[in-house]
């Protein structure tokens, strides 16, 4: 009834005149109302609205960070994780190890006829974790030597013990009835040589290294009566002599010997009498101090068997506790949710394992297995972290830019995308320590520097980068000195100069490393301005300080000063930017806002010039202001002689000044720490002995023209490298002697010639006198000698250069103490600094020949230049080798424990024997570091592709990776990455993920595109260059100021090309003739096709434009990185974690290197867990509640269960649908039939009536 009423009213409305319009309006109002209602509903649920439609809220927090992000680009996080306690994983590890052993067994069978014994497994390296535990130069022999063996008899029994200084017996702590022998040595090198010599022999005795400790609670210790530990002194003491001079009188009188161990902050004392310990212990209680610090004396205990108390770095047993997971991933995810909530999704790459606490129902987290990302599934299973990392960019659905983390890496402070990448400066690259040297004694800066270095002349260093190929390379060690080069203040055994010498202010310190925001040890020297402030301001007093004043713009640097720095503390709060005039005297200039200083490092020996600076500062009100200053500099410095002696001789035409001895300062560096290593030869051996060459001393100006011309020719041949120095001396001596024999001018002969024999007799009264002088560092050897008043001629006798007048009578084996003062003149004021007295060997005194360059034998140059230093006026700091400590070995636990390292070392040795088919006794074997070897391997590949340069290793921290860049890298080196993917365990020929990625990003070059240059110049985008645009192009390819010839020359090139090139290339016919008009009517329309195909113009453009980096990047320091290697020393771990608490960093890595079998392992893990809970106590959305855990811990189990669940769900739905349909048909059969008849009515068929039939 109601339906009929509604139907009648509808028809009435539609039949009305305006009914149709009213209905249309009603429909529109209804639709608008519906949209408005929907909008209100969405506003009520604003957070869900933004999650669905706002890209700024597409992150794990579901909040908008629009005011903090530079762009709404989605950024995902990728983790690599493994559960080391999984039994299935441990079984697979054991299988891989057995497979490697079988392969090596087969290799030994091949070598059976040439191998006397299999290669020994690497010895376990034990680490002492006791308090103040130090390794001392002692060897412990078990069982003890016979009681009648004395120190003199010891070398006859063990020849390697010839350097032993003492021997005594002690009783075993656990078995006092038996003794062990303790052999004492003077140095670490002696004890290591003796230890290795004893291991090579067939001794039946077990040999141990000796340790001393103050921890008396550990069993197996022996108290040393005459030894004691001194602690509590300030940590600033780094040298033994420094501490010895500060000891109180009552303490030093009872000490026979003292040895400082600065790394452990203790000193070992050898007492005169064992009873002195009690007296000293009482005296320390009376507040005996050094610099306000109270001293503590502790007894010293000897131990040698570390197996019960130490951490094994190379344990061979597999156990679940060894690779135990400390749930670092849980806390790393908490750090992301707290400090980086802008992350979109999180992907966890595993070998199929699932964390028991992970909430798999969270849509923001996804487990990715190796099968999902590896292209070649035959490479699986893999246990190599580089192999896994090389495939993570192939994760499906991953953002273009993603952040890669290991589970032991977390965020300590708020982190934003611009900490990794910014549009203005590009990728931010965090670098740490340098790449290990390619060979022993060959720093990276030596490769391809124009000199052939013996240490680098091997395949590992690519034959010195080509310097040793042919005769193009010169010698780094030139006996006669560098005629054209200058001696910098680098290492005293290396002459400066060479092709790229200006790129390095010190050996191993490139100019690009200065002011790079982290302290480089090689740059922390005076010649580099102490790394331009990166290493702190402790040494700023050694630099020349200039204070910038608000009303002063002109400053004058004293002559000879090349390392000034400017303090702007009185002018501004911080520096914003700065620019300086292009001047060849400048090596480096930078602003250090931390110290409010401007550092200027200049090349020495340069003429006077003026440098202009344009600086932008910020005052205390954060207002920017500009400041222009001019600085007058002159880095030349004249010689400063301590004493000279001049004596005129009758026979000389010109006076001769005695060559002063240069003031030489040495640092007392132990011989075993000196670098590089070189082999010494006996100077009296027949191989090194050379025939004495006597060159007459002549006044060149008195010689005939033909003789002078011949000498000049010899000088040119030597300078060009056509002859060696030895050949030069022989030729010059023969030429002068032949002239003397044939000369009829006796007067000239008597006046101009003094032979070496007469020279010796003349200086006999002054043989014992030593003359000292300070020559400027910045001058070359030849330049320094030019300032003296005599012609210098150098001769070589028995491999040593001898000065001709007068030879200093110093024995080559003498050792003496040099007490010197360093004088530094600044603006007329002389300041003196007295360094500690040093014991140095002086084996020969040599003088350099003026303007002599050449190449000499490798053995001679290595020894002479390593031992003979002249003109070095600064005390060079002890060179610390570029090394890496606590390096990152991989995210997999078996890589941290070096589980496969022994097998890899043995495989390397066997492969070497197979390659050369030699006897294993003659095959030297050296344990290798796989991680360091792989860095060298990648560095060698990068050198071959992008050129030789010094590189550093990226920090172990989160890295932002671009999928496109990573794919380009792998497309460039497909074989290398495929080999990396093939390796089952970490290998020395792996492509290191971060190292290869970032150096490809920093080295990739974008080839110059002429079309882009044309588009830049074509400012009106007309496709044809106008006169004004042609002038712009001319300024880009010519030096300023632009001359008329430059402009007309460019136009003539274009005119000639338009006449020579075909019309279909220049496309001049397609250009309207009135589009551009030129001053020169002969100039055709300058189109893009004309410019790009005109070779003279393109050559000019290529010459003016340099290839640009394909990707922008910025080198960052280590200020925001905290890398801690967690070991089993509880007190050390607590100190490390407290340092992070006090100084939070953005990027924190706690690398687990805990020995889980150690007695203190559970304590360390508890301390670590407490630290995690204190930093991140709030559970993240990715965790299950504490009372729940995942049912499945492997993806294959989960996938099987999901497949079974889906199948069961499908059949359940089918059955349910069948039941519903059956129920409907059973109860509503009549209604369904009626509905069917109503929807599909049956049509009735009416038959026609028969025509013959008559209706009645």
UniProtKB/Swiss-Prot annotation:
Impact after mutating residue 455 to S: Rare variant; found in individuals suffering from stuttering; uncertain significance
CDD domains from the UniProt entry: RRM1_GNPTAB, RRM2_GNPTAB
Sites where the protein binds Ca(2+): 449, 464, 467, 516, 531, 534, 1018, 1020, 1022, 1029
Stated consequence of mutating residue 927 to A: Abolishes proteolytic cleavage by MBTPS1
Transmembrane segments: 22-42, 1215-1235
Catalytic EC class: transferase
Protein EC: 2.7.8.17
UniProt-reported outcome of changing residue 346 to A: Partially cleaved by MBTPS1
Keywords: Calcium, Disease variant, Disulfide bond, Glycoprotein, Golgi apparatus, Membrane, Metal-binding, Mucolipidosis, Repeat, Signal-anchor, Transferase, Transmembrane, Transmembrane helix
SUPFAM superfamilies associated with the record: Notch domain
Main function: Catalyzes the formation of mannose 6-phosphate (M6P) markers on high mannose type oligosaccharides in the Golgi apparatus. M6P residues are required to bind to the M6P receptors (MPR), which mediate the vesicular transport of lysosomal enzymes to the endosomal/prelysosomal compartment.
Protein name: N-acetylglucosamine-1-phosphotransferase subunits alpha/beta
Organism listed in the record: Homo sapiens (Human)
Biological classification of the source: Eukaryota, Metazoa, Chordata, Craniata, Vertebrata
């Amino acid at each position: 009834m109601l339906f009929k009423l509604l139907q009648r009213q509808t028809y009435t409305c539609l039949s009305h005149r305006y009914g149709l319009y009213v209905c249309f309006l009603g429909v529109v109002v209804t639709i608008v109302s519906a949209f408005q209602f929907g909008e209100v509903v969405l506003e009520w649920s604003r957070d869900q609205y933004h999650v669905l439609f706002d890209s700024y809220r597409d992150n794990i927090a579901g909040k908008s960070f629009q005011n903090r992000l530079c762009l709404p680009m989605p950024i995902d996080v990728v983790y690599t994780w493994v559960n080391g306690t999984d039994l299935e994983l441990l079984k697979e590890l054991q299988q891989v190890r057995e497979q490697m052993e079988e392969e090596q067994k087969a290799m030994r069978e091949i070598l059976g006829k040439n191998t006397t014994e299999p290669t020994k497994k690497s010895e376990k390296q034990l680490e002492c974790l006791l308090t103040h535990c130090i390794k001392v130069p002692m060897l412990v022999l078990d069982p003890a030597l016979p009681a009648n063996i004395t120190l003199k008899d010891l070398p006859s029994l063990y020849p390697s013990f010839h350097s032993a200084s003492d021997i005594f017996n002690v009783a075993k702590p656990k078995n006092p009835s038996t003794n062990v022998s303790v052999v004492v040595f003077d140095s670490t090198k002696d004890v290591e040589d003796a230890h290795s010599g004893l291991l090579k022999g067939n001794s039946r005795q077990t040999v141990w290294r000796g340790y001393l400790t103050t921890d008396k609670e550990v069993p197996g210790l022996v108290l040393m009566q005459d030894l004691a530990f001194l602690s509590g002194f300030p940590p600033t003491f780094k040298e033994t002599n420094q501490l010895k001079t500060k000891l109180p009188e009552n303490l030093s009188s009872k000490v026979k010997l003292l040895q400082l161990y600065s790394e452990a902050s203790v000193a070992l004392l050898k007492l005169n009498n064992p009873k002195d310990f009690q007296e000293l212990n009482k005296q320390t209680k009376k507040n005996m101090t050094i610099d306000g610090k109270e001293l503590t004396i502790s007894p010293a205990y000897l131990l040698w068997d570390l197996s019960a108390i130490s951490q094994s770095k190379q344990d061979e047993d597999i156990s679940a506790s060894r690779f135990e997971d400390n749930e670092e991933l849980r806390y790393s995810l908490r750090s992301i949710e707290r400090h980086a909530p802008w992350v979109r999704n999180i992907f966890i790459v595993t070998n199929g394992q699932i964390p028991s606490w992970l909430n798999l129902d969270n849509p923001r987290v996804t487990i990715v297995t190796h099968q999902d990302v590896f292209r070649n599934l035959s490479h699986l299973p893999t246990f190599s972290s580089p192999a896994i990392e090389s495939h993570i960019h192939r994760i499906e659905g991953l953002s273009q830019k993603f952040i890669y983390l290991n589970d032991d890496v977390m965020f300590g402070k708020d982190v934003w995308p611009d900490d990794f990448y910014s549009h203005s400066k590009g990728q931010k690259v965090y670098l740490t320590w340098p790449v290990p040297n390619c060979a022993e004694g060959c720093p990276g800066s030596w490769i391809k520097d124009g000199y052939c270095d013996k240490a680098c002349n091997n395949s590992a260093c690519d034959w010195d980068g080509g310097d040793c190929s042919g005769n193009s390379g010169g010698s780094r060690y030139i006996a006669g000195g560098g005629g054209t080069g200058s001696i910098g203040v680098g290492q005293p055994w290396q002459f400066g100069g060479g092709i790229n010498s200006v790129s390095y202010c010190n050996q191993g310190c490139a100019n690009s490393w200065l002011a790079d925001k982290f302290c480089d040890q090689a740059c922390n020297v005076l010649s580099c301005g102490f790394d331009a402030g990166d290493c702190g301001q402790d040494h700023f007093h050694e630099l020349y300080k200039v204070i910038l004043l608000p009303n002063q713009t002109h400053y004058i640097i004293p002559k000879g000063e090349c390392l000034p720095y400017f303090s702007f503390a009185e002018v501004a709060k911080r520096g914003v930017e700065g620019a300086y005039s292009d001047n060849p005297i400048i090596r480096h200039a930078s602003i250090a806002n931390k110290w409010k200083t401007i550092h200027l490092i200049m090349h020495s020996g340069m003429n006077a010039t003026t440098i202009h600076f344009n600086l932008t500062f910020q005052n205390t009100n954060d207002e920017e202001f500009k400041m222009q200053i001019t600085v007058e500099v002159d880095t030349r410095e004249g010689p400063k002689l301590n004493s000279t002696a001049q004596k005129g001789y009758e026979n000389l035409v010109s006076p001769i000044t005695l060559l002063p001895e240069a003031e030489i300062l040495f640092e007392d560096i132990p011989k075993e720490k000196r670098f590089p290593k070189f082999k010494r030869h006996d100077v009296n051996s027949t191989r090194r002995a050379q025939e004495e060459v006597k060159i007459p001393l002549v006044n060149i100006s008195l010689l005939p023209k033909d003789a002078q011309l011949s000498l000049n020719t010899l000088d040119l041949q030597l300078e060009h490298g056509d002859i060696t120095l030895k050949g030069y001396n022989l030729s010059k001596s023969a030429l002068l002697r032949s002239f003397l024999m044939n000369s009829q001018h006796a007067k000239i002969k008597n006046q101009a010639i003094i032979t070496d024999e007469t020279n010796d007799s003349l200086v006999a009264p002054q043989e014992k006198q030593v003359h000292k002088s300070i020559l400027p560092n910045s001058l070359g050897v030849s330049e320094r000698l030019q300032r003296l008043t005599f012609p210098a001629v150098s001769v070589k006798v028995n491999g040593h250069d001898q000065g001709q007048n007068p030879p200093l009578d110093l024995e080559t084996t003498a050792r003496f103490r040099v007490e010197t003062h360093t004088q530094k003149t600044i603006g007329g004021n002389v300041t003196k600094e007295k360094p500690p007295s040093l014991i140095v060997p002086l084996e020969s005194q040599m003088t350099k020949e003026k303007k002599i360059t050449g190449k000499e034998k490798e053995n001679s140059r290595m020894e002479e230049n390593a031992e003979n230093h002249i003109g070095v006026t600064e005390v060079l700091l002890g060179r610390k080798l570029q090394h890496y400590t606590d390096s990152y070995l991989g995210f997999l636990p078996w890589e941290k424990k070096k589980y496969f390292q022994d097998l890899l070392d043995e495989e390397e040795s066997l492969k070497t024997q197979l390659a050369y088919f030699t006897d294993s006794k003659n095959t030297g074997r050296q344990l290798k570091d796989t991680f360091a070897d792989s860095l060298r391997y990648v560095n060698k590949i990068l050198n071959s592709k992008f050129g030789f340069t010094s590189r550093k290793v990226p920090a172990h921290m989160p890295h932002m990776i671009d999928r496109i860049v990573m794919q380009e890298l792998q497309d460039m080196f497909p074989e290398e990455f495929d080999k990396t993917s093939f390796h089952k365990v970490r290998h020395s020929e792996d492509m290191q993920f971060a190292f290869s990625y970032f150096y490809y990003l920093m080295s990739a070059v974008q080839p110059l595109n002429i079309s882009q240059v044309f588009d830049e110049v074509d400012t009106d985008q007309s496709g044809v260059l106008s006169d004004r645009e042609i002038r712009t192009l001319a300024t880009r390819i010519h030096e300023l100021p632009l001359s008329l010839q430059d402009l007309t020359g460019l136009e003539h090139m274009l005119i000639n090309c338009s006449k020579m090139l075909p019309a279909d290339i220049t496309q001049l016919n397609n250009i309207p003739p009135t589009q551009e008009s030129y001053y020169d009517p002969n100039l055709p329309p300058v189109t893009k096709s004309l410019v790009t195909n005109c070779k003279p113009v393109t050559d000019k453009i290529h010459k003016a434009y340099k290839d640009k980096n394909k990707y922008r990047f910025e080198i960052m320091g280590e200020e925001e990185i905290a890398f801690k290697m967690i070991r089993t020393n509880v007190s050390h771990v607590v100190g490390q974690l407290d340092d992070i608490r006090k100084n939070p960093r953005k990027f924190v890595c706690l690398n687990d290197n805990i020995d889980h079998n150690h007695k203190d392992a559970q304590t360390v893990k508890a301390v670590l867990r407490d630290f995690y809970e204190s930093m991140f106590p709030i559970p993240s959305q990715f965790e299950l509640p504490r009372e729940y855990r995942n049912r499945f811990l492997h993806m294959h189990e989960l996938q099987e269960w999901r497949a079974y669940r889906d199948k069961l769900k499908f059949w359940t739905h089918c059955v349910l649908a069948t039941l519903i349909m059956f129920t409907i048909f059973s109860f509503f059969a009549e209604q369904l039939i009626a509905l069917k008849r109503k929807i599909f009515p049956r049509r009735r068929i009416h038959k026609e009536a028969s025509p013959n039939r008559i209706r009645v």
